Amino acid sequence: MARIAGVDLPNKKRIEYGLTYIYGIGLYKSRQILDAAGISYDKRVFELSEDEAAAIRKEIQEHHIVEGDLRKQVAMDIKALMDLGSYRGLRHRKGLPVRGQKTKTNARTRKGRRKTVGAATK
């Protein structure tokens, strides 16, 4: 099992799909990395030599932001929006949808479980 960017990649998968298990790498970026490292997409993870794995690690480390660094950057970007007091920042702070969705009936994922209002018993 190859370990790249702190993630164990599944052995039986093709390397182009195996790399997508790393946070911040999708199929397009995976193919870019493999092209830069000169590795075939058809190769399976367990078929990688140590040199090829090192080439992938080097490419990711030098040219891509992944895993913890990317999570930290996203969190910092959201915090900056909140500190600015922008509309998007306020929506993040209140735990409501940020991208203009209606909230009268839906948005349960973002708002959480329903809070019943006005159903008091005598």
UniProtKB/Swiss-Prot annotation:
Protein family (similarity comment): Belongs to the universal ribosomal protein uS13 family.
Keyword Hydrolase: no
PROSITE patterns the record matches: RIBOSOMAL_S13_1, RIBOSOMAL_S13_2
Subunit structure: Part of the 30S ribosomal subunit. Forms a loose heterodimer with protein S19. Forms two bridges to the 50S subunit in the 70S ribosome.
PANTHER family from the UniProt entry: 30S RIBOSOMAL PROTEIN S13/40S RIBOSOMAL PROTEIN S18, SMALL RIBOSOMAL SUBUNIT PROTEIN US13M
Comp. bias regions, Basic residues: 95-116
Described purpose of this protein according to its UniProt entry: Located at the top of the head of the 30S subunit, it contacts several helices of the 16S rRNA. In the 70S ribosome it contacts the 23S rRNA (bridge B1a) and protein L5 of the 50S subunit (bridge B1b), connecting the 2 subunits; these bridges are implicated in subunit movement. Contacts the tRNAs in the A and P-sites.
Keyword rRNA-binding: yes
Name of the molecule in the record: Small ribosomal subunit protein uS13
